[in-house]
Amino acid sequence: MKLTLNRILFSGLALSILLTLTGCVGRDAHGNPKGMIWEFLGKPMSYFIDYFANNAGLGYGLAIIIVTIIVRTLILPLGLYQSWKASYQSEKMAFLKPVFEPINKRIKQANSQEEKMAAQTELMAAQRAHGINPLGGIGCLPLLIQMPFFSAMYFAAQYTKGVSTSTFMGIDLGSRSLVLTAIIAALYFFQSWLSMMAVSEEQREQMKTMMYTMPIMMIFMSFSLPAGVGLYWLVGGFFSIIQQLITTYLLKPRLHKQIKEEYAKNPPKAYQSTSSRKDVTPSQNMEQANLPKKIKSNRNAGKQRKR
């Protein structure tokens, strides 16, 4: 449940960043794009689309595909680094499950909100002690670096002159395409399925809804926009599959082996909570407070006996 919640939160974060960046590309009074992202990234991409389409004679459809491939190839290392960090944290969590299991049981069996919060605080402390990032190791910096490129390419495919009046393999790039939308949905569904194959059965059950979230979102976005933009999402789908294949079959096995060797040399130890040291009952406090009085009364009784 926690992993699913983290994915939902970061999906919302990614969508929010995308909406923010798209707001940077507006239109002037003549309908032309403007904004910082467009000037520094979108306009050069639009130039290369026009170059491949007209100077190289490849047409706008193939030009969009080529420029998208170039852009996605350049930022692929950032995506792989992000996947590596998330996979590293996931593998560590799997190895440390026996360490965290007693605390998780206390969270589930808590009889009050105070007990639950105390156990959750202890779980976070135990995770920090073992080098676990509660957010799954998904850093915001790689995402922030990638989003301007995604946004710029998105608008370059939409606003480049000549795209809306061109065709590609019988598809009108200026209109919506049901065929292209179906292909895009299939690609992102396959990518979601691949990501589920890389996790345990327990996590797979929790991620079932996420398997359909991305394809449904892509259907909505692709069918509500011209096919020229759909080509951008199409190429992006292939790159998402490539990134997931590299993560599942190259990165995760290596990380699994690496972490297994690390914990074989230094086995993880059970987390020792310090809260129990502060657990002093009221009766003990009263006894300690009354101890000087008892000693004093005993001394007085001894003096009276001597007299």
Swiss-Prot record:
Membrane topology designation: Multi-pass membrane protein
Signal peptide annotation: 1-23
Family: Belongs to the OXA1/ALB3/YidC family. Type 2 subfamily.
Regions of compositional bias (Basic residues) in chain numbering: 293-307
Membrane-spanning residues: 58-78, 135-155, 179-199, 209-225, 231-251
Biased composition (Polar residues): 271-288
CDD domains: 5TM_YidC_Alb3 (cd20070)
Gene field: yidC2
Gene Ontology molecular function, alphabetical: membrane insertase activity
Function: Required for the insertion and/or proper folding and/or complex formation of integral membrane proteins into the membrane. Involved in integration of membrane proteins that insert both dependently and independently of the Sec translocase complex, as well as at least some lipoproteins.
One Gene Ontology term, aspect cellular component: plasma membrane
Protein name: Membrane protein insertase YidC 2
Source species of the chain: Streptococcus pyogenes serotype M1
